């Protein structure tokens, strides 16, 4: 009986992994993605990758607060894709403010591309929010590295991160999901109290 339960569990895990790989590949995000967080599955992993000036799309997903993009290289972000680990009843949607175009009229979701490629347009700001039946159980935090300003403060749950009206490019981004109401991510290296949005 015990062996049967163990086999069912292994089968369920394999099915979930296959669904994840299928979702990742369907949305154009590399299947080299892997999922891990140090909290033992208390909250969903978030993966993201950016399209960087003169480099194109990053080949693999960046996870859970790590930096996607470049710092100190003077390269603009041109587009982004974001995806949340399945199985938690949570999805993600996002939109960007694009050079000479302004805010996208529609929100992109679950691995879709927000921004442009091949047009040499910089991203200037971003909004990200959770969707799904369990969206109110978590907060999504994100911050950007902006031209001239460096790392800005953390934004969360659909608020704006970046700049507008200043012609400043986004250069890098960090995104993390945590249980609702827990403390915000460590503010370093941005100074405590640094605004998430400059305009």
Report residues per predicted region:
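Bacterial N-terminal signal peptides that target proteins for export
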Residues: 2-14
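Secretory targeting and sorting signals
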Residues: 11-25
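Sec-dependent signal peptide cleavage junction
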Residues: 21-39
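Lectin-type carbohydrate-recognition ectodomains
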Residues: 33-199
